[in-house]
Amino acid sequence: KFGGTVDPGHVAAVALYHDATEIFTGDLPTPVKYANPDIQAAYKAIEQNAADRLTATLPEELRPSFSGLLSETDPQVTDLVKAADKLSAYLKCVEELKAGNLEFKKAKEQTYAALCQNPIPALNYFMEHFLSGFELTLDELN
């Protein structure tokens, strides 16, 4: 529908493993990670080191497959994974607010604004056609 050339299965696999290196690095907040080019470059090197360490724990025959998933460089793939990650963060905010946790109000607004700025057609389609359903209660879904 969107004329893309990436393999959706590959994108999904990269998305599943994109945070796996955090078992070694921990989760660095996005504003810190991108505070300046030096920090961003240093963190990329740290993530690559963590990916190498993680891959080294696997049996030899599995390493090539997982190495590619942990170190994806195709911008079409990485842009889709980043968009999905941002969407997931937004949906987490929605769920927290539905549960009464008002600490997520500002994060929801900021994340939504960032999603609206994203030019990926598939993301925009999802937001237009499906996002409102996540705001509904179970009673409203039935």
Which stretches of residues belong to each language-model region?
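Alpha-helical, largely C-terminal catalytic domains
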Residues: 1-142
